[in-house]
């Protein structure tokens, strides 16, 4: 026949590991959402600062910002 059945004896359930036991508490709050805005404003500030940082790096890379005392070849 073209099909073959697999015995269910190979399915022994999830295997417990030391790493899994250590990481289990981190997943205990899965699916729960804190009421209100939470840390959203903090994340917005972090994203804005990161965008400013990236724009400064881009301007330095493009030599559009002149830095005194630093020679650019």
Swiss-Prot record:
Highest taxon, organism lineage: Eukaryota
PTM per Swiss-Prot/TrEMBL: Phosphorylation is a light-dependent reaction catalyzed by a membrane-bound kinase; phosphorylation occurs on Thr residue(s) in the N-terminus of the protein.
Membrane-protein topology: Single-pass membrane protein
UniProt-listed GO biological process terms: photosynthesis; protein stabilization
Any GO molecular function: phosphate ion binding
Modified-residue entries (Phosphothreonine), positions: 3, 5
Compartment list: Plastid, Chloroplast thylakoid membrane
InterPro entries for the chain: PSII_PsbH (IPR001056), PSII_PsbH_sf (IPR036863)
Keywords, comma-separated and alphabetical: Chloroplast, Membrane, Phosphoprotein, Photosynthesis, Photosystem II, Plastid, Thylakoid, Transmembrane, Transmembrane helix
UniProt keyword annotation of Flavoprotein present: no
This protein's GO CC annotations: chloroplast thylakoid membrane; photosystem II
UniProt key word Membrane: yes
Pfam families per record: PsbH (PF00737)
Transmembrane regions listed in the UniProt entry: 41-61
Major location category of this protein: plastid
Function comment: One of the components of the core complex of photosystem II (PSII), required for its stability and/or assembly. PSII is a light-driven water:plastoquinone oxidoreductase that uses light energy to abstract electrons from H(2)O, generating O(2) and a proton gradient subsequently used for ATP formation. It consists of a core antenna complex that captures photons, and an electron transfer chain that converts photonic excitation into a charge separation.
Subunit structure and binding partners: PSII is composed of 1 copy each of membrane proteins PsbA, PsbB, PsbC, PsbD, PsbE, PsbF, PsbH, PsbI, PsbJ, PsbK, PsbL, PsbM, PsbT, PsbX, PsbY, PsbZ, Psb30/Ycf12, at least 3 peripheral proteins of the oxygen-evolving complex and a large number of cofactors. It forms dimeric complexes.
Family: Belongs to the PsbH family.
Protein name stated in the entry: Photosystem II reaction center protein H
Organism encoding this protein: Piper cenocladum (Ant piper)
């Amino acid at each position: 026949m073209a099909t073959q059945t697999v015995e269910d004896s190979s399915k022994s359930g999830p295997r417990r590991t030391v790493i899994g036991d250590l990481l289990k508490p981190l997943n205990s709050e899965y699916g729960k959402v804190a009421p209100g805005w939470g840390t959203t404003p903090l994340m917005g500030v972090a994203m804005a600062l990161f965008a400013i940082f990236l724009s400064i790096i881009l301007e330095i890379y493009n030599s559009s910002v002149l830095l005194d005392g630093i020679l650019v070849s």
